[in-house]
A protein has these predicted regions:
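Extended active-site neighborhood of metal-dependent phosphoesterases/phosphodiesterases
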Residues: 25-41, 95-218, 241-255, 259-314
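N-terminal active-site segment of His-dependent metallophosphoesterases
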Residues: 2-10, 14-104, 477, 484, ...
């Protein structure tokens, strides 16, 4: 054993003890936790805002910006208190969508489009708040640089609101706080390894303090809504493992609004968070993802009515005619109650109706689902008088006691509207509970997978499961083979494996023999061990990580090591866990298959040799059989060339061999094709030359497969 294992163990020890890249650079504290505050007045205790997300304005798809005129038309009818643009403002990709870069023309288009929306929609520009998404940081080496067009063309930049935390307060009979968080990378790694939001300890603390700020200074209740680009499932923990969810629960926010995942995944990515705080108090909040403008043209109207939060989503494929948003009672399936423990029954029905037409009549009907949805009550609603010119709130009183029920979905509400053109419009039927009960529907598995699984943790599970499996696959069979290789009993056992019918041998006999025979070639086994250890600790490849013509960076399993513009430092472990889009496909689809296929080629080589050996032994006399019994399994297949030179076959037949070998070679070709496909995508993303000149990623898997296929060609009689 001493002759086989010291080298790889020494290499493993060396790589483990080697200083690994560490986070030697962080954003400046002021940038990391800076806060901007804005205060706007409102009338009464009902406020509404509009959210748009994932605009993806593109040079190659001008209709995305042009059709934002539909949003401007809608805003004229809605007249929201705020317009929130939650990230991915520009697309920042080429026409083939294979590489990323910042395009100033897209940002100029965005600025012009917003100016047009302001003129068309009649909204005060200072009430528009936009934040970065991951696409807005593709290829931005540092904030404030020449490629950081958000700092030049965004609405927030025009009002000097470039802090990572934006706090907005609407003040009326109650106070409503909207808090925006920019969790994009300070060093903008290019596509595809820029997928997650990245929180920091200082930013989380800044959010915590800011959510308390207005509460400590207000004499009226404060309802809090937080917005950002990234869902919580795609937001990484801070350096000390802190997360926003506990802060949101502790500060009793009502909802977190986000984008990022697009409507192609689902138009109902909603999640109810229940978290037990340090004081052993259970708190909760909703997380509502809004689908994209890019392909789906989605817009959300969100309202707060006395602390109750509700919303409705619209697809703006054509101009918005009339929108009906029931602000109270809220939908018992997906709407939030500010504090269910302090819930008090309200004898109100409140509805916001946004329309370009004059509204003539509004009524609400209550249906009983336990009685085949028969109408229980029809209630007329009246426009609430207001000092402001545009406050489309309709109200009615009812006896809420009549609708007490043990079921949160027994009673359903629908609103009917008649406008001045005689057009009748109705809202969607939705359940309600006057007691604040909830009936959260079961999510489809795709929604659960993307929106409720914490992908930062899932990455660690998938990554280390793969690495543990790979290390076991390399070392355990080698140890077994080392102990039994010189034993005649092993050679007899190997012969018995082949001589007995397959059905008489259990699968694990074949598996053990396959793994042990696969490790017989010392050069290949050592090469695979050193390669895997290299992937764990050393750089995989080099590339232009932060801009098309920027400095060369290195990608490790733990993230990117990128030269930082100030002080000559290195920003390390950047884009972690974002690199999962590179590492997991490579490990699962290339590295593990390469090892298994190499094992298979050498095991198949041994099978062919043993079968030929048995035929020769059976036809030889007993003396020759006794003389040759000590060399049943040759160390190198090349030795066969000297023993069986009288029956040469063509090189192609020798190379392809049996059907088993042909299947293995076909699998090698498929694995090589997958590998080359992954490499070509990375070449497009980070530069052809540096990727080609990165042997660990580009060349070693192919060389291992080609070498194993060549060395296992068996020359037999």
């Amino acid at each position: 054993m001493a002759s086989d294992l010291p080298l790889p163990l020494f290499v493993l020890l060396f790589l483990v003890l080697l200083p690994t890249p560490c986070s030697s650079w962080r954003p400046a504290d002021d940038d990391d936790a800076s806060v901007s505050r804005s205060v706007f007045p409102m009338d009464g205790d009902v406020a509404w805002v509009v959210q748009a997300s994932d605009l993806h304005i593109s040079t190659y798809n001008p209709e995305r910006a042009a059709e934002l005129a539909l949003l401007g038309t809608a805003l004229r009818a809605i007249r929201p208190h705020l317009l929130l643009v939650t990230g991915d403002i520009t697309d920042a990709k080429n026409q083939q969508r294979t590489t990323s870069r910042q395009d100033e023309y897209e940002w100029v288009t965005y600025k012009k489009t917003i100016d047009a929306i302001v003129g068309q929609g009649g909204i005060d520009k200072s009430r528009i708040f936009d934040i970065r998404g991951n696409h807005d940081t593709y290829g931005v080496p540092y904030r404030g640089g020449k490629l950081d067009f958000f700092s030049t063309y965004s609405v927030n930049s025009q009002f000097k609101r470039l802090s990572t935390v934006s706090s907005i307060l609407l003040q009326g009979d109650r106070s409503y706080q909207f808090l925006g968080i920019d969790d994009t990378m300070s060093v903008g790694i290019r596509f595809p390894a820029n997928l997650f939001g990245h929180s920091t300890d200082k930013r989380i603390e800044a959010v915590n303090l800011e959510l308390q700020y207005w509460t400590n200074r207000s004499n009226v209740p404060v309802t809090k809504v937080v917005f950002g680009h990234f869902p919580m499932s795609f937001t990484a923990s801070s350096e000390k493992g802190q997360r926003y969810e506990s802060v949101f629960a502790r500060q009793s926010i009502s909802a977190y609004l986000c984008g990022h995942l697009h409507a192609k995944v689902s138009k109902q990515l909603w999640r109810y968070h229940e978290i037990r705080t340090a004081e052993d108090h259970k708190s909760s909040f909703w997380e509502w993802e809004l689908g994209d403008w890019k392909d789906s043209r989605l817009m959300r109207i969100l309202a707060i009515d006395g602390g109750a939060v509700s919303f409705i989503d619209h697809t703006l494929k054509q101009a918005l005619e009339t929108s009906i948003l029931v602000t109270y009672p809220t939908d018992s399936r997906s709407m939030n109650i500010l504090d269910s423990e302090k819930w008090s029954m309200r004898n109100d029905i409140n509805v916001l109706i946004f329309s370009h037409q004059v509204i003539r009549n509004v009524s609400a009907r209550v249906f009983d689902s336990h009685s085949e949805f028969k109408i229980v009550e029809e209630i007329p609603l009246q426009l609430v008088a207001s000092t402001v010119t545009h406050r489309p709130l309709y109200h009615a009183k009812w006896n809420a006691e009549n609708y007490r029920s043990s079921s949160a979905t027994r009673y359903w509400l629908q609103v009917f509207v008649l406008d001045s053109h005689g057009l009748k419009i109705s809202s969607e039927q939705r359940p309600f509970s006057v007691e604040g009960k909830m009936a959260i529907p079961t999510s489809p598995w795709t929604n659960y997978l993307l929106f409720e699984v914490q992908w930062e943790d899932m990455y660690q599970v998938l990554l280390w499961s793969n690495l543990a499996f790979t290390i076991v696959l390399l070392f355990i069979p080698k140890l077994l083979y080392h102990f039994v290789r010189r034993s005649s009993s092993y050679q007899r056992w190997a012969l018995s494996i082949l001589s007995s019918p397959i059905q008489q041998r259990k699968a694990y006999f074949w598996l053990v023999w396959f793994l042990m025979e696969g490790t017989r070639s010392k050069p290949f086994w050592f090469s695979m061990v050193i390669y895997v250890l290299w992937l764990i600790e050393m750089p995989w490849f080099w590339g232009h990580a932060t801009s098309e013509n920027g400095e060369i960076a290195q990608m490790y399993l733990s993230g990117w090591s990128v030269p930082v513009h100030d002080g000559g430092l290195m920003g390390n472990k950047l884009s972690n866990p974002d690199v999962l889009v590179i590492t997991l496909p490579f490990l699962y689809l290339v590295v593990v298959p390469v090892i298994v296929l190499i094992y298979g080629l050498f095991a198949e080589n041994s099978i062919v040799f043993l079968r030929h050996r048995r035929r020769i032994v059976s036809s030889a006399d007993s003396a020759n059989m006794h003389a040759e019994s000590s060399i049943m399994l040759p160390v190198a297949p090349r030795a066969l060339l000297m023993k069986f030179t009288d029956k040469m076959v063509s090189m192609m037949i020798q190379f392809c061999g049996s059907w088993t070998r042909r299947a293995l070679l076909l699998s090698c070709l498929i694995t090589a094709a997958i590998h080359l496909k992954l490499c070509s995508k990375l070449m497009s993303a980070y530069g052809i030359v540096p990727i080609v000149l990165s042997p660990p990623l580009t060349w070693i898997p192919l060389l291992l497969l080609v070498g194993a296929a060549y060395c296992t060609v068996l020359h037999v009689d």
